[in-house]
C-alpha cells in the first residue's frame, strides 16, 4: 500500500510543479529537466506516470474545460439563449488568450495536439445539443460532434492569430461568432443580437476576473502558488 501512496504523492508533486511552470514561463520553455529538478523526482518516476510532458497538460486541460459555460452563465444569466451562452463563453476564451500569452500557448496547443483536441471536442460536443437543439432538431450526437470538429478549428485559428490595429479584438469576436453561429443554423438576426450583446460587455474586465478565478482554482487544485501575485 505504501508504494501506491508514494506514486500518488509523486504524481501530485509533478502536477503541482508543471502547472505552475506552464503558467509562469510557458509550456514550451518548461523543460523535462527543469520539471525533474523542481519536483525532485527521477526521470523513471516521471515517465512511469506521464509518458510525455503533453500528458501532464491533458490533466490541466481537463480541469480547465470541465466547467465550460459556467462563467458565461454567471455573466449573461443561466436562462440566456444557447447562442448567447456559446457566444459569451467563446468570447471569454478568445479574450483570455489575447490577454495572457502563456494561456494563448496552452489553448493553441490544446486545440492542436490530437489527444488534447479530442478531449476538448468531446467535452464541448456534449454541451452543444442543449445550446443548439432548437436550431438543428434533427441532429444527434454524431452530427453535433462533427460540427464541433469544424468550429474548434475556427477557434484555434483565431486564438493563434494575435490582434493588431488592423484586426482588433472586437473584430475578431465578431468574425468568430458570425462563422460559428452560422454553422449551427442560428438565424442572422439572432446572430446579430448575440454579437451586439457580447460587444456591449466589458469583455476584457470579465476575462481578467475569469483568469484570476481560474488561477486561484488551479492553485488550490494542484497545490502551488504562482509567483508575482
Kindly give the residue locations of the regions a language model identified.
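Helix-turn-helix
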Residues: 21-55, 59
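Hydrophobic alpha-helical connector segments
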Residues: 59, 70-103, 113, 121-125
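Amphipathic alpha-helical packing segments from all-alpha helical-bundle domains
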Residues: 111-160, 167, 171-178
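C-terminal peripheral helix-coil segments that are non-catalytic and often amphipathic
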Residues: 133, 164-229
Amino acid at each position: 500500500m505504501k508504494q501506491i501512496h508514494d506514486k500518488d504523492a509523486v504524481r501530485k508533486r509533478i502536477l503541482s510543479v508543471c502547472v505552475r511552470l506552464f503558467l509562469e514561463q510557458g509550456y514550451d520553455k518548461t523543460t523535462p529537466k527543469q520539471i525533474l529538478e523542481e519536483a525532485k523526482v527521477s526521470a523513471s518516476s516521471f515517465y512511469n506516470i506521464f509518458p510525455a510532458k503533453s500528458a501532464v497538460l491533458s490533466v490541466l486541460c481537463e480541469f480547465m474545460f470541465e466547467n465550460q459555460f459556467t462563467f458565461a452563465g454567471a455573466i449573461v444569466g443561466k436562462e440566456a439563449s444557447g447562442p448567447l451562452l456559446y457566444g459569451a463563453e467563446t468570447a471569454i476564451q478568445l479574450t483570455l488568450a489575447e490577454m495572457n500569452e502563456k494561456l494563448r500557448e496552452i489553448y493553441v496547443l490544446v486545440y492542436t495536439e490530437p489527444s488534447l483536441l479530442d478531449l476538448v471536442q468531446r467535452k464541448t460536443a456534449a454541451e452543444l445539443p442543449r445550446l443548439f437543439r432548437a436550431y438543428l432538431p434533427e441532429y444527434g450526437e454524431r452530427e453535433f460532434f462533427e460540427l464541433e470538429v469544424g468550429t474548434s478549428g475556427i477557434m484555434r485559428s483565431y486564438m493563434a492569430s494575435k490582434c493588431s490595429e488592423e484586426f482588433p479584438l472586437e473584430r475578431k469576436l465578431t468574425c468568430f461568432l458570425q462563422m460559428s453561429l452560422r454553422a449551427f443554423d442560428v438565424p442572422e438576426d439572432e446572430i446579430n443580437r448575440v454579437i451586439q450583446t457580447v460587444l456591449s460587455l466589458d469583455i476584457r474586465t470579465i476575462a481578467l476576473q475569469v483568469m484570476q478565478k481560474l488561477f486561484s482554482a488551479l492553485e488550490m487544485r494542484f497545490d502551488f502558488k504562482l509567483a508575482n501575485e
